[in-house]
């Protein structure tokens, strides 16, 4: 299917196509600016890079937070690997948008496999192995060599001075 970027984001508007109004346009403008994709709205989604597609999907997620009265509809954002296919600058941009959302009162739940990213940008971390939570707490509480080695079955080192995790 060949949809424009705007149409892909529009699919996230939970009120349905009959409610595409000026309120939607305001929400679209807001998420377009936040995700820095406004210039892509008329472009075919199929022509985007993997990182651009990821940003469009993120914008579609954000627009779901507003109803036709542009009042906040949801207080939680749940994302699975939102930084996949993003270069470092766009990864940080997305993380900073999410941090801003937490300051606005939103709860943000993210599944990440990048341990360093999880350590540096999370307030709380849960490690799940075989469907069970085996460690939960602040990054400083759970990013311990013993815990990480048990979870991953690898030799894991954590450098307290640089706050970097290495595994081999």
Each model region followed by its residue ranges:
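A short, surface-exposed alpha-helical micro-motif characterized by mixed small hydrophobic
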Residues: 118-120
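ABC ATPase "signature
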Residues: 136-137
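H-loop/switch region of ABC-family ATPase nucleotide-binding domains
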Residues: 112-113
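ABC ATPase nucleotide-binding domains
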Residues: 149-168
